[in-house]
Amino acid sequence: MTTILKHLPAGQRIGIAFSGGLDTSAALLWMRQKGAVPYAYTANLGQPDEDDYDAIPRRAMEYGAENARLIDCRKQLVAEGIAAIQCGAFHNTTGGLTYFNTTPLGRAVTGTMLVAAMKEDGVNIWGDGSTYKGNDIERFYRYGLLTNAELQIYKPWLDTDFIDELGGRHEMSEFMIACGFDYKMSVEKAYSTDSNMLGATHEAKDLEFLNSSVKIVNPIMGVKFWDESVKIPAEEVTVRFEQGHPVALNGKTFSDDVEMMLEANRIGGRHGLGMSDQIENRIIEAKSRGIYEAPGMALLHIAYERLLTGIHNEDTIEQYHSHGRQLGKLLYQGRWFDSQALMLRDGLQRWVASQITGEVTLELRRGNDYSILNTVSDNLTYKAERLTMEKGESVFSPDDRIGQLTMRNLDITDTREKLFGYAKAGLLTASSATGLPQVENLENKGK
């Protein structure tokens, strides 16, 4: 069976991930007119720029959908977002600022839940609006086939017939109007935006040029913290975790993770927390650029890692960062549910996140400027008295440290011999450039 269909399968049911925007509206109407039987599926991901979800399926029916369903994906999306925080599943960072993989998380949820809904309706052909140059076409492909092994893929944007007739937004708008729908193109922005409850992605158009900065972006989850005319008073906030799970903000306990994430977004968004400008490597190895918002994810991540560093030992923290970066890359590639990702997730959640219990107090200022004011946890292995510089009872004595330093002589001696060996091989010389003149007789030993 051919998995990818290059041309419209007339007479067959096709499920389309329907956003209600111009592209998917025109595609749905075009497919209906060409003889297909389109079914529309809309994911409610809590997008901050969507005002009326209930209206989207109604529009789909007007454009010719055989049926239209709204699938509430918010609970699952937040669950996966919290799992990503617990695992540190983020691999793209620039200057200490993190991209929280909010779009890949959204695709993991959408790609599985919508295809599962289609399968319930006997729909085994799926289309969406992803283009052949991006990451989403592969993410949706993987998640769709994981959910339904019998799935076939039809994307209007890979169909030359569709492209020849409706190859651009102007043509799509004219097509909708000609068919009796008063569909006006929205005002063109200088960039494209995709969002869900966890974060927003701004990319393409003017943002493809690196001399266009964050200053051209109008945040949808935060504020223009770079604009001095925007007043942003400092704010203290406390975040509480229990066994790796965020449960309270400013003393308010949440039993609903969706409401907790919305409140975290509101708090962080008031300051523009979590905005970052990243150059990243797409799945196909070409570089792209995006400006990201994720105020709630950033707030929870900061508090989580503060507790992490105070609770776990150095080697565990190192493994958390190493495995988290690996997991973040798998998530980015659309492999969040692959076996290697599940293995990494299980270890990080079981042995790292389970011990993260406590409360962190921060002061948020402008953008990513913040201070940590207090850290409280019964699980802290940070003990001030162990290394206090004040006089008093200590957990070890000067003689203990002398013994420990004496034991270091073994590896120091070995290291000196290695340096002499490198000099003999011509790899090192006793020059100021190498910083080795302090090692006595190095040049002589190397001869």
From Swiss-Prot:
Entry keywords, A to Z: Amino-acid biosynthesis, Arginine biosynthesis, ATP-binding, Cytoplasm, Ligase, Nucleotide-binding
Pathway: Amino-acid biosynthesis; L-arginine biosynthesis; L-arginine from L-ornithine and carbamoyl phosphate: step 2/3
Entry GO CC: cytoplasm
Family annotation (InterPro entries): Arg_succ_synth_type2_subfam, Arginosuc_syn_C, Arginosuc_syn_N, Arginosuc_synth, Arginosuc_synth_CS, Arginosuc_synth_type_1_subfam, AS_cat/multimer_dom_body, AS_multimer_C_tail
Localization in the cell: Cytoplasm
Residues that coordinate or bind ATP: 17-25, 43, 129, 131, 136, 194
PROSITE patterns: ARGININOSUCCIN_SYN_1, ARGININOSUCCIN_SYN_2
Binding-site list for L-citrulline: 99, 135, 139, 192, 201, 203, 280
UniProt GO MF annotations: argininosuccinate synthase activity; ATP binding; protein homodimerization activity
The EC number(s) this enzyme carries: 6.3.4.5
Transmembrane segments: none
GO BP, sorted A to Z: argininosuccinate metabolic process; L-arginine biosynthetic process; urea cycle
Catalytic activity line of the entry: L-citrulline + L-aspartate + ATP = 2-(N(omega)-L-arginino)succinate + AMP + diphosphate + H(+)
Cytoplasm in keyword set: yes
Binding residue positions for L-aspartate: 131, 135-136
Record-stated family: Belongs to the argininosuccinate synthase family. Type 2 subfamily.
Subunit comment: Homotetramer.
NCBIfam families: argG (TIGR00032), PRK05370.1 (NF003779)
Name of protein: Argininosuccinate synthase
Gene: argG
